[in-house]
Amino acid sequence: MKQRTGWTVVLCAAVAVLLAAAQQSDVIIKIEKGERAVIALPDLRGSGEAQQYMDAFNQTLWNDIDSAGIFRLVPKSLYWLQVPRQPQDFRPQPASPPNATSNVRPNAQGLWLSDWAGPPVSADYLAFGYTGVDSRQIVLRGWLYNARQSGASNAQVFGKTYLAPLGEDGARKIAHEFAADILQQFGAVSLSGTKIYFVGERARGMKEIWSIDPDGSREKQLTFYKSLSITPAASPDGTRLAFCSFAHGSPGIFVQSLETGRRLSFYNESSPLTATPEFTPDGKQILFASSVTGWAQIYIANLDGSGMRRVTYSRSIDMEPKVNPKTGSEIAFISDRSGMPQIYRMNMEGADVQRLTSGEGEAVNPAWDPAGQHIAFSWTKGYAPGHYNVFVMDVATRQFVQLTHDAGRNEHPSWAPDGRHIVFSSNRSGSLQIWTMLADGTQLKQLTTQGRNTQPVLGK
């Protein structure tokens, strides 16, 4: 029993917390593999009341394009003094470009498209436009131009008008939409419209569920139980949040509406432990771990907790069920049936159990990618207990790659809908915070700074 209790502490963050608490266009521009298109994103200006919201607009646009990981953004310090607001601002291309000492373009550099393609900017693409106000709406007219085209008349990739309620939220909304349309031209998916749900600790001994946008904006507290609320999971349609809470004493599953903020009905069988909820891809059922019969086992139930059915039948601790989002027919989970926590998979009936990780250290926190072909997970891989790093495994070949290296504790990976980004928690900056990175381990970005934050999951 002593051995199992010690293992439980390191099985997963969920159990550790419990023990501690007890204590437009169809044309896609193709970029060759390994290359990144260079894009210039000069600050757009607004007229009238729109101008006061342009800082939020420009920062949001920059963050969305930068975080996509498919562009190299030109530093704004290299941009020309004059930025076109609309296509009509471009000057006719001269027959031959002037040399560096020419006065052909006095005080007008930037109004020739070739200015943006040549040094020091050297951009492949230029995004520009302007905003104004109409009937209490902020209006953006935005364009994307191919700066390598000879002449502005042939350079337009797309131009579009965007509308949103006047205000900072509206400015962010049209920036997200403009960025999404830019990314769409290159076959990339914008993360705008998604949310990161996580466990935030702002007061000692109290953990609540919070949300934040993928660009680090609009951080918001969602639960107020003044207790421990952990292991969040978002429903596929973005209407429900499931999590484990100590609010009523014993840890149980709570389900909360993301539309109203109200708690929804969910029946919990009497059990010392009920945790790690996960919605099925169709959003009709919830999987979770419960110790109602002794050791924690995996169960599945309806959204209100009815129809509870046991899935695993081991004399071990089985937790953290994650359903393949593509097939909906297999579950990845963690178990100590081989001695230390490892990742396994099985079908929805609990049969055809296969071990995926090697046993060289503790492997926890499995997370399927949207295509259902890879699993991100946390692994000590020979290090001392607790020193986790994030890995990604190809499920078919069992080959894996390490994404984080020698930078503290890195755990709880979760995939973004685009399959290109991973959100995770790390204490590399001192305390546990929420970070994002590309799925190759590059372009790391810290999203949270206050308190301690962990167990992130992506949802709508």
Q: What positions do the PLM features span?
A:
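Short loop/turn segments that connect beta-strands within beta-propeller blades
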Residues: D213-S217, S257-G261, N302-S306, N347-A351, ...
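A flexible loop/linker signature enriched in serine peptidases of the S9 family
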Residues: S190, G200-E208, F224-S227, C244-I253, ...
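C-terminal/domain-edge helix-coil "capping" segments
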Residues: A22-A37, S135, R148-T223
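Amphipathic beta-strand/beta-sheet edge segments enriched in Tyr/Trp
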Residues: D89-D181
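Short beta-strand->alpha-helix linker/helix-N-cap micro-motif
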Residues: I28-W112, Y130
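Hydrophobic beta-strand positions that form the internal "hydrophobic ladder"
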Residues: I196, L241, G283-L287, I331, ...
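Residue-level detector of Asp-centered blade-edge/turn motifs that repeat once per structural unit
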Residues: S190-S192, P236-D237, P281-D282, P325-T327, ...
